[in-house]
Amino acid sequence: MAPRLEFKLTPPPGPHPGIGVIGAGFIVADCHLPAYKHAGFTVNSLWSRDQTKAKAVASRHGIGTVHSDWRQLLDDKQVRVVDVAVPPNAQPEVILEACTRPHIQGILAQKPLAMDPATASILVTACEKAGKVLVVNQNMRHDQAVRSCSNLIRSGWLGKPVLATIDLRAIPHWMPWSEGLRSLTTYILSVHHLDTFRAWLGTPDRVMASTRTDPRTNFPHTDGINIYILEYDQGPRALGIDDVWTAPLKPSSPMDTTCPGNQSVRFRVEGTLGWAEGTIGWPSWPARQPSTLDFASRSDPGTIHRPRWREVWFPDAFAGPMSELLWQLRGGPEAELCGRDNLQTIALCEAVLQSGKSRQTAIVSDYMPQN
């Protein structure tokens, strides 16, 4: 018999503290807020630099207050938890400011927490000193197939992990703010897969990365296509391929009808007792396409298990990180996605970035802040 798969985290019971959201882009409007509403969370205020957009999003989701300034939202005593949904280069200022508000108990930051390990460490330390619960919205860990695969690994169903792979051939929802950052694919997209490998196997010891600019996009960047190998002293290996402007689709136009495209994200984990493999459904967004998982083990000879669910990563999995934060505020366990843990994901991103630049193996611990 297969182990029980907890493919989603149960939200804590209400009443819930008031949530204020800073930002009103598509990921907030179409993922954060629908997921929070379905989970029964209380979002009572919103801010966006584009006030027209903020008012439209608030009206759509029944949010009563639209603030004219993000600092005004932080001053709102009805806000106990802040969902910071701004670009990564703007996020540190907001988090540090939130640390100065005594009534704010929790902060949900977006991934990447920061664009370099040193800044990320400053934010984590500031939240700890201020007594704020900091959780990073690495929501791929709450994708239903990814989370179920984590269950299989932790239960020992697959035996000792041997090899894990993630192969992405898809175009993410690139935002204009991603242009001009010190890293493109590594910190904005690969961060999802690197964090998932950490959830499955732990933090690796070494990284070998190959990266190149992608001729299919139209703005300057350094890390376009990423290929990386993660090495663990205890034995496992992981391989990631992030082809983020996959041919033949054009990055800023409809599908090229002269050569139909085929976007996909596939993963596989092999252990000494079994295997698990599946697909990630987000490339079909806005259509609801659940991720899939198939697995087998010597513990259940002759059977391939194929659990399925109706939930999808976009938007349903977005309730997971906020649930972790709210459970911790209620006295539950420390969030798996806590800021301190995320420093290892940021260090891993930096190791991949530097390995790709130097064409040499990078030691992940070299990029961990020493505090």
Model-inferred region functions:
Residues 1-15, 81-83, 324-371:
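C-terminal helix-rich "cap/oligomerization" subdomain common to oxidoreductases
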Residues 2-5, 188-285, 319-333, 350, ...:
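Contiguous beta-strand/loop segments that form the cofactor/metal-binding neighborhood of enzyme cores
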Residues 125-132, 147-161, 268-271:
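Basic phosphate/pyrophosphate-binding loop/patch that engages nucleotide-derived ligands
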Residues 50, 61-126:
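Beta-loop-alpha module in the N-terminal Rossmann-like domain of NAD(P)-dependent dehydrogenases
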Residues 140-228, 359:
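Predominantly a Rossmann-like dinucleotide-binding segment in NAD(P)-dependent oxidoreductases
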Residues 28, 67, 107-109, 134-136, ...:
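Hydrophobic residues in well-ordered beta-strands that form the structural core
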Residues 2-61:
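N-terminal Rossmann-like dinucleotide-binding module
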Residues 27, 49-50, 310-323, 340:
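Active-site loop of classical SDR/Rossmann-like NAD(P)-dependent oxidoreductases
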